Amino acid sequence: MNISIIPTGDEILLGIVVDTSSAYILQEFIKKYPDCEITRKTPVADKTDNIIKAMERCVASKADLVILTGGSGGGHRYSSTLSEDYTHCALGEYLDEFEESEIYGSNGHLWCKLVCGRKKKSLVINLPGPYVEACAALDAFLEVYDPKEIKLSQINQRMIHAVYNQYPNTQASYIK
């Protein structure tokens, strides 16, 4: 199995935030699939075109699985001072087919969006930026992932519920 990890976000690219999720992804995949080949790509800036190009390179290199970590949230829908959701825009634009789910807070703001889909023969998923949420989503993915029978909806639902369970009951309002 050939796996590519693409960390996204200006904060990771510039070294403002340390990418701890990639190390966890590597560790967990090596535990479950000791013969897999994993490559962590150079972090990608928050620009839709850059993220699409990074995914294109991974798919062209015949990656079985492409994992994007972090990126921008959906806060720009509520405040123009918050950044655009580049990672999810890129996923929606690039993938041939996909499933997506969102978690909203009691204030109505988007807290998390997870996408899993296909491009050619590659499965592409994203993990949230916050480490605890990323670990929960990855653990859920690994529980349900079967390289021989990929069910996008099942993968997406398992991952989003795992992330939802990381929030206190009084704060996370609903899953869409």
Predicted regions and their residues:
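Non-catalytic beta/alpha edge segments that cap or flank active sites
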Residues: 1-176
